[in-house]
Amino acid sequence: MTDAAGAAEEVAPEEEPALVHGAVSALSRGQLVVHPTRERYLAVVGALQEDGYQMCVDLTAVDYLAQESRTLPAGVRGQRFEVVVNLLSFTDRRRIRVRVQVPDDDPRLPSLFALYPGTEAQERETFDMFGIVFTDHPDLTRILMPDDWEGHPLRKDYGISRIPVQFKGTPRPPGAGGGETSR
């Protein structure tokens, strides 16, 4: 296996891509980015943890609804969703980004909770907002939206008009007349 610290060259589109733990990698704005397949995602992140990446700083998703043909390293096929994970090594003062493609017709990935317990809320938020299911997550329930909410608001095909807006009483300054609230 290749150590993550050793892959430090930018990969031109026509060159053979560099590999980190069997996953395509490249530099993006000076940061190493690893693109594992969905099937290798958990193994690659586990190997990066063994390389000294002690903390998962962030886990989120991007919906590329109309941009599945965006520029990616050779060997990486774009999908509608991309889960982005940022890892940090305190001892070596290094960061690495993991970007995994997730198809629209089966939006699921293994949970990182067993490796990084701090991802519990991040995976729940990604599930709540994008509908990506993290298998083996201990409590994959909504975290931001009400339990009975339909849909996933950060998906690009989620209709904005579907969001109900509730106007309850608007506070008025004392002495403005009409009572304490208006309706």
Question: What are these model-predicted stretches?
Answer:
Residues 1-183:
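Terminal low-complexity/charged segments
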